[in-house]
Amino acid sequence: MFDSTLNPLWQRYILAVQEEVKPALGCTEPISLALAASVAAAELEGPVERVEAWVSPNLMKNGLGVTVPGTGMVGLPIAAALGALGGNANAGLEVLKDATAQAIADAKALLAAGKVSVKIQEPCNEILFSRAKVWNGEKWACVTIVGGHTNIVHIETHDGVVFTQQACVAEGEQESPLSVLSRTTLAEILKFVNEVQFAAIRFILDSAKLNCALSQEGLSGNWGLHIGATLEKQCERGLLAKDLSSSIVIRTSAASDARMGGATLPAMSNSGSGNQGITATMPVVVVAEHFGADDERLARALMLLHLSAIYIHNQLPRLSALCAATTAAMGAAAGMAWLVDGRYETISMAISSMIGDVSGMICDGASNSCAMKVSTSASAAWKAVLMALDDTAVTGNEGIVAHDVEQSIANLCALASHSMQQTDRQIIEIMASKAR
């Protein structure tokens, strides 16, 4: 429940964060397909004997090389099988949180028997599309997700249509929080962060708790490329400084290591991505600890980073050729700059420098190597903050960076939304040729 005295715009900010910052177990593209399969299985009469699935090229790209939690296996087929046999249809992005050892074994057996197929949907005009059809004899159920990782638009069985999402907005219905956010500015977001009641945003502290637990798992286990653990060892060997900069990179990349390596711990996601949530959150948590920030100060920094990351990513396609760890790290830069300095000018300079630094990084699918990009983005964010604290930043005379941070963001997002579409097609073509 909201305080009725709360600024209506601020209420929409909070709703936007609650919609876009959610726990997610496993990489969200395979999880989206697992959710479709799980919901379909819940509609099916009898046990699942066969699974057929179709996904958009972008979802295929992000599902080819990532480990599905608890299975030790990579790819969309195991995600679809486990979703159908062991998923919790009501758990959203945590659909696999209750999967048992028996369900995992059954899913692997279904896969080994050749009863699971995942193909690219053709034609497909959607960036994010997943459809799962499960069978029991001649009986079947089919679920389609479009536009968002949990946005179910159609459910159908052999008996007929069960559910279809209405395309139109009902008369009098409130505008979505993301639509409101798209018309705001970073300055307005900062005003909200500085002035909102702590009680209204205390919930965001959970994002620090979840991602810190994932980071600790990444440092204690042998997950993915174990970048965080490796860099921590280099600190002990004297090859890397034991300082704040190293700690930011180590703890952030460790969380991504665990997530991409298949750890059965949820990440607090941002904009439908666990890695984006990790990249935005962990650098700020480390800096907050360094300065001894209390819960209220940390919560305000977390709201700033999450809203900034959502605000930027909302101007992009849900999935694209641009590595979104870079835009999430712009949120981290905002949060860290606020903790150290608090000035709008410092925050905007840090984001501008980020755009001038890592904006060309491509997304070549979800995999263990995502942790490399997460670590690079986190490092770049702290570098940009340090520059801004010295009143230095990439200026509007250089590259795609403009004199105004809002225009710089728009320039970056235009690049990803339009010019990089051909890049995305080339990446998908290369990855598809490897999978043949």
Curated annotation (Swiss-Prot):
GO molecular function: L-cysteine desulfhydrase activity
Segments traversing the membrane: none
Identification of the protein by name: UPF0597 protein YhaM
Pfam families: SDH_alpha
Cysteine disulfide links: none
Coiled-coil intervals, chain numbering: none
Gene: yhaM
HAMAP family: UPF0597
GO aspect biological process, one term: L-cysteine catabolic process to pyruvate
Family: Belongs to the UPF0597 family.
